[in-house]
């Protein structure tokens, strides 16, 4: 696994990102990214971090496939991942429990040939 902090122009931490469950023999990995403060979202930090992580996964580590999962309630993240080139593969129904209610969990992926 690889983990990095996401920082603003002044070096303040705004989030984190990582490649998890890297399986070189299978050429696949999972990606995670979180910028928890709504004030720091939609400022380009996520886009820059995602571009760096996908470049690392596909070019440095020669992965063929990168997967990501997101709670269906997080429509902003779903749209962001689609903008970055991820495609929905499936839905885990009622797989996430938050504030007394269940929500679906959306599985997405991007293949190396689809990146840039």
Protein language model annotation of sequence segments:
Residues 81, 86, 108:
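Conserved active-site tyrosine of GNAT-family acetyltransferases
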Residues 38, 68-78, 95-99:
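Conserved beta-strand-loop-alpha-helix junction that forms the acyl-donor binding cleft
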Residues 1-39, 111-114:
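Acetyl-CoA-dependent GNAT
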Residues 42-56, 75-83:
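Conserved acetyl-CoA-binding loop-helix of GNAT-fold acetyltransferases
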Residues 101-116:
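Terminal substrate-recognition subdomain of acyl/acetyltransferases
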Residues 59-69:
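Conserved GNAT acetyl-CoA-binding A-motif
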């Amino acid at each position: 696994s690889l983990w990095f902090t996401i920082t603003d122009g002044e070096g303040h931490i705004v989030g984190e990102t990582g490649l998890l469950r890297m399986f070189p023999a299978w050429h696949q990995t999972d990606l995670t990214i979180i910028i928890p403060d709504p004030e720091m979202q939609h400022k380009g930090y996520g886009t820059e971090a995602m571009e760096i992580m996908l470049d690392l996964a596909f070019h440095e580590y020669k992965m063929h496939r990168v997967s990501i999962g997101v709670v269906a309630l997080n429509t902003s993240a779903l749209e962001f991942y689609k903008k970055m080139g991820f495609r929905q593969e499936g839905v885990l129904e009622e797989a996430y429990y938050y504030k007394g209610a269940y929500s679906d969990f959306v599985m997405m992926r991007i293949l190396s040939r689809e990146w840039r």
